[in-house]
Amino acid sequence: MTADLRAACDGWVDVAVLDDAALDRAIRDRGIDVLVELNGHTGGNRLPALDRKPAPVIATAIGYPNTTGHPCIDWRFVDAVTDPPGTEARCTERLVRLDPCFLCYAPPADAPEPAMPGEDAPPTFGSFNEAKKLQSETIALWAPVLHAVPESRLAIKARSAAEPAVRASILARFGAAGIDAGRIDILPFAADTRGHLAQYARVHVALDPTPYNGTTTTCEALWMGVPVVTLEGDRHAARVGTSLLRTAGLGELVAPDAAAFTRIAAGLVRDRERLVRMRSGLRGTLAASPLTDAPAYGRRFHDALRACWREWCARSRA
């Protein structure tokens, strides 16, 4: 991927080897007009390098599901579902809404064909999200689904779940919610993308965590023909699933409350005919939706950058 990105750029600078002061100088020396940072407050971020405002316009996008709180970042790219009108006061940045969705999904070229679990397989809910998202709110949301379908199982796939302490913690938390450890399958880590995606063949319906929804995991599940049920939350991180599903034309999988979440998820595995019909068309539905329309997304992103720059120019002339 690095090679592909480098080939598509007019210039490429390895900023990992630069300290914050050197990165500040590198941005200024190249006359960058609009700078987009993609990390926010995540590991390895370079927010301190922005402290002296090295570019006239600075935006944050995609990588962090909240305001950065950074005084030198002007704009934050979101959409009208993740950050509806009226939520502006939650952010230090001004919001740019890239409707219908703030991101675009590029399906992997080597993804296997979608496959349904066998007819004799028990109803299996699943999540391939990071284990740190499986906190109390998520377990409180998912446990009633498993109770509503007593013969069902839950498949969890997360890199850290292979660690004994993490695995034990997950099982203990579900146990406290009345879910026996024998109903939970911890799937093995896959060495490559194809192997990772192939494991969706073990899952009937995916469950979205809350309040920190899946993003790539949701898109991957849909691409592999697995419907994802999400709870519409009250902040960006808890509304990403809603944005993705509505953009894909799958608003029926968005639950307004916990009771509806249980009803939707349990209803899908109980109605095999409906589930088979839905799964058979999911990849095509996603492929035809704005969520995978890269050229259209590119135009929206371009137009947003241009609008931010023009706004700065107008203010500078005033």
Locations of regions flagged by a protein language model:
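Residues at helix-coil transition
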Residues: 147, 269-270, 287, 306, ...
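Glycine-rich phosphate/pyrophosphate-binding loop
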Residues: 79-141, 292, 298-317
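Conserved nucleotide-cofactor-binding alpha/beta core module
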Residues: 1-72, 81-86, 154-274, 279-294
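Conserved catalytic-core segment of nucleotide-activated headgroup transferases in glycan assembly
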Residues: 100-192, 199-201
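Short, flexible coil/linker elements and helix-boundary hinge sites characteristic
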Residues: 178, 317-318
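Active-site lining segments that contact anionic ligands and/or coordinate catalytic metals
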Residues: 72-73, 92-93, 120-122, 151, ...
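Surface-exposed alpha-helical segments enriched in charged/polar residues
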Residues: 25-28, 143, 147, 266, ...
